[in-house]
Amino acid sequence: MNAATISSPHIELPALPYEQNALQPVISANTLGFHYGMHHKTYVDTLNNLIRGTPFADMPLEKIVKAASGSADHAAVFHNAAQAWNHAFYWRSLKPNGGGAPPAALKRLMDASFGSVDACKKELAKSAVEQFGSGWAWLVQDGEKLKIVKTADADTPMSQGSRPLLTIDVWEHAYYLDYQNRRADYVNALIDKLANWEFAAENLGRVNPS
């Protein structure tokens, strides 16, 4: 995944794929600045401190996530690596003037898996809104089918063997400055106006989405 690279041997904070104000009015520049420049950066910085001098230091980010998953001894490494990966994936799941109709290949799978594109969007929104506490809602590919899954805290569908296509961050820091406790408003606006269905379609059938 291009969301993170190794550099002597640290994991780098990826550049945002758009300007900080590009997602307004759904996500303000203020929220994006704090979310990316403080929260995401902290996960990357903490991870680099944790892996320095360990076998993880020579691994790409996705491999760290998979190697540390389920290990109590490496819980801190997993949490920070997964959050770094999840956030990089989240930024690419959004785009200015997004939403709308998905590409044909993705639409066919949405129709086959959920009955319609609208039904898929509704299930994704429901999952995101109903996730208890912090976490993520994901559109994933599982074999020939698409599914909606929720993960708590830092967890990722990669730990469950599914292929992520698109994600929504429902940690409060993703929306609280703009929406306070109105998570549903954030989720619905994101799906309607920012969802990057082209990115989701690009990830179909790929082992390492990018």
Residue ranges and their predicted role:
Residues 1-210:
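Feature for soluble, non-membrane regions of globular proteins
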